[in-house]
C-alpha cells in the first residue's frame, strides 16, 4: 500500500516510471483512502470511481511520461472548480445537480499533463466561510483532531492532503481560503499573485480577489503544481502575460542575506499567545539561517476585514445573481407561480444562511445612497493597504507572520457569531486586497494543533516565497510529522 505521508511527487513519479506501481493501482489506493475517510473527515462531496479508473487505465495504456512528474498522479479538486461531466456544486443546494459541460482552464492544463481526478472536495458554500461548516453536504473535520474545524473555505482539500488521503489538491483563495486551512492542517498552501492563474471555470465569489492554488504536503511539490496551472489565458482577461518560471529552480539556495520584514500589527492583541510563540521561534530560525530580520508596519491592515466584507460581498451579490433556477441547478418550480415567485423560492431555498447574509450585505453596500459611504470607502482603504505593502517591499524581499489568529477551533463553536468567524481571516485578507502571493507552511504546534507561518512575497515573485519556505521546511523537518490516522 502506498503511504502518501511518506511520498512526494518525485518518489511517486519514480515508482510509476519504474512500474513498481501502475496509475490504476495508485488511483485505486487513493479512491479507497478517500472513501474510507469519509465517515471521519467528510472531505469529499463527490468521489468519481468510474471516471478516475477509466482515466488511469487510459494513462497506463499510453504509458507514464518520464519527463512529466504529474503523469498518473491522483488529484482532488475543490468543488467550485468546474469539471466536465463531473458534478460541481460549490457545496450549495442550488447547484446540487449541476454537471458542467466544460473544464476550467486549470483542469485542462492538468489533464494535458496526465493527472487523475479522484473527486471534488467539500468546502464552505460558494467559498463563503472559514470553517467548512456552511456546506450543504455536511461539515468537514480537521486532520489532526476530528472535533476541530479544518478551516475554510478549502477545508476538504486541506484535510484530505493532511490526512494522507491524496497527495495533491486544488483550492481557491478569496480572503484566506487556501492559507487558513493549510495552517489549521499543517500543510503547504499557496495563494498565487492575482493574475498568475486563470479563474476561467472557477465559480466566482469575489472576482477581483479569487485565485486558484495548490495544497500539498511539501514545498517542492507545491512549486511543481503551481507551474503546471499558471499562465496567460485568453478566456480570463485578468490573467497577466507573465512568463512561468520553474519555481523549483533556486529553491535550495537558502536564505542568507534575505531581507525579511515582520509586521508589528501581526502580533498585536487578539493573536493567540501559542501562535505568537511558535511563529516567533520560526522567524528566529530564519535569522540563524542568515536572513536579515526587522520589524515593519502595515498600518492599514487592521481595516482589511471591514473593507473586504464590503468589497467581496458586493462582488458576490452580483456574481450570484445568475443562480435563479431557470437554466440549471435547483429550481423551486410550481404550477401557476409567477416568475418572481420562482426566483424568490429558488434562491431562498437554494442558498444557505451565510450566502444569503453576504448577498444582502453586498446589495446594501451597492444600493443608492450607500455606495459612497461603503463601497467607495472600502475601495479607498484597499488602495491604502496596497500602498502599505509596496512601501515595505521597497526594502524587503519577504514578509513573515502568523497565518491565523489562533489554531483550529471547535466544530460548531463560532457558527452563531459571524463577526468572530470573520475575524479569523484578519491576517490573510490584506494579501487578497493587495493581489499579492502568500503561502502558509507548518511552523510548529501549540496544544497539539498545527500553527501556520505566512510567507508574503512581491507580485509575481512566488519563487522567493518557495525558496524561503523550503529553507525552513528542510531545517525543521515538520513535513515528516503527520496525524495519527491511517486510511
Curated annotation (Swiss-Prot):
Allows the formation of correctly charged Gln-tRNA(Gln) through the transamidation of misacylated Glu-tRNA(Gln) in organisms which lack glutaminyl-tRNA synthetase. The reaction takes place in the presence of glutamine and ATP through an activated gamma-phospho-Glu-tRNA(Gln). GO terms for biological process: translation. It catalyses: L-glutamyl-tRNA(Gln) + L-glutamine + ATP + H2O = L-glutaminyl-tRNA(Gln) + L-glutamate + ADP + phosphate + H(+). It comes from the Bacteria. InterPro entries: Amidase, Amidase_CS, Amidase_dom, AS_sf, GatA. It is an enzyme of class 6 (ligase). Signal peptide: none annotated. Belongs to the amidase family. GatA subfamily. NCBIfam families: gatA (TIGR00132). This is Glutamyl-tRNA(Gln) amidotransferase subunit A. The active site is at 78 (charge relay system), 153 (charge relay system), 177 (acyl-ester intermediate). One of its GO terms (molecular function) is ATP binding. The lineage of its organism: Bacteria, Bacillati, Bacillota, Bacilli, Lactobacillales. One of its GO terms (cellular component) is glutamyl-tRNA(Gln) amidotransferase complex. Heterotrimer of A, B and C subunits. Keywords: ATP-binding, Ligase, Nucleotide-binding, Protein biosynthesis. Its EC number is 6.3.5.7.
Amino acid at each position: 500500500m502506498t503511504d502518501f505521508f511518506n511520498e512526494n511527487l518525485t518518489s511517486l513519479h519514480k515508482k510509476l516510471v519504474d512500474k513498481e506501481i501502475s496509475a490504476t493501482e495508485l488511483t485505486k489506493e487513493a479512491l479507497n483512502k478517500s472513501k474510507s475517510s469519509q465517515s471521519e473527515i467528510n472531505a469529499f462531496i463527490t468521489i468519481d470511481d468510474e471516471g478516475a479508473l477509466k482515466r488511469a487505465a487510459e494513462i497506463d495504456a499510453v504509458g507514464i511520461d518520464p519527463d512529466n512528474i504529474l503523469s498518473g498522479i491522483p488529484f482532488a479538486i475543490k468543488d467550485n472548480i468546474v469539471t466536465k461531466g463531473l458534478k460541481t456544486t460549490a457545496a450549495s443546494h442550488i447547484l446540487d445537480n449541476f454537471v458542467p459541460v466544460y473544464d476550467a482552464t486549470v483542469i485542462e492544463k492538468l489533464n494535458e499533463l496526465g493527472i487523475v481526478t479522484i473527486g471534488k472536495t467539500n468546502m464552505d458554500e460558494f467559498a463563503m466561510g472559514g470553517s467548512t461548516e456552511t456546506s450543504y453536504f455536511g461539515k468537514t473535520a480537521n486532520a489532526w483532531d476530528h472535533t476541530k474545524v479544518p478551516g475554510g473555505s478549502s477545508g476538504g482539500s486541506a484535510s484530505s492532503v493532511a490526512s494522507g488521503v491524496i497527495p495533491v489538491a486544488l483550492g481557491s483563495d478569496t480572503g484566506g481560503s487556501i492559507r487558513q486551512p493549510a495552517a489549521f492542517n499543517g500543510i503547504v498552501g499557496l495563494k498565487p499573485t492575482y493574475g498568475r492563474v486563470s479563474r476561467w471555470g472557477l465559480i466566482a465569489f469575489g472576482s477581483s480577489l479569487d485565485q486558484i492554488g495548490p495544497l500539498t504536503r511539501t514545498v517542492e511539490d507545491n512549486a511543481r503544481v503551481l507551474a503546471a496551472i499558471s499562465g496567460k489565458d485568453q478566456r480570463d482577461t485578468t490573467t497577466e502575460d507573465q512568463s512561468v518560471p520553474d519555481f523549483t529552480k533556486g529553491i535550495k539556495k537558502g536564505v542568507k542575506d534575505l531581507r525579511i520584514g515582520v509586521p508589528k500589527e501581526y502580533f498585536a492583541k487578539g493573536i493567540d499567545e501559542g501562535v505568537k510563540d511558535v511563529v516567533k521561534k520560526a522567524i528566529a530560525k530564519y535569522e540563524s539561517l542568515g536572513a536579515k530580520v526587522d520589524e515593519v508596519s502595515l498600518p492599514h491592515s487592521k481595516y482589511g476585514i471591514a473593507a473586504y466584507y464590503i468589497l467581496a460581498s458586493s462582488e458576490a451579490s452580483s456574481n450570484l445573481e445568475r443562480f435563479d433556477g431557470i437554466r440549471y441547478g435547483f429550481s423551486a418550480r410550481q404550477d401557476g407561480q409567477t416568475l418572481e415567485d420562482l426566483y424568490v423560492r429558488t434562491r431562498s431555498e437554494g442558498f444557505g444562511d451565510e450566502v444569503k447574509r453576504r448577498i444582502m450585505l453586498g446589495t446594501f453596500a451597492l444600493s443608492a445612497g450607500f455606495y459612497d459611504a461603503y463601497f467607495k470607502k472600502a475601495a479607498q482603504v484597499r488602495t491604502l493597504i496596497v500602498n502599505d505593502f509596496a512601501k515595505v517591499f521597497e526594502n524587503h524581499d519577504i514578509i513573515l507572520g502568523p497565518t491565523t489568529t489562533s489554531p483550529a477551533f471547535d466544530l460548531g463553536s463560532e457558527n452563531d457569531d459571524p463577526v468572530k468567524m470573520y475575524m479569523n481571516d484578519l491576517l490573510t485578507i490584506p494579501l487578497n486586497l493587495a493581489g499579492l502571493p502568500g503561502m502558509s507552511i507548518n511552523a510548529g504546534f501549540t496544544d497539539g494543533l498545527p500553527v501556520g507561518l505566512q510567507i508574503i512575497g512581491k507580485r509575481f515573485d512566488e519563487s522567493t516565497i518557495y525558496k524561503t519556505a523550503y529553507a525552513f521546511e528542510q531545517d525543521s523537518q515538520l513535513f515528516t510529522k503527520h496525524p495519527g490516522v491511517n486510511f
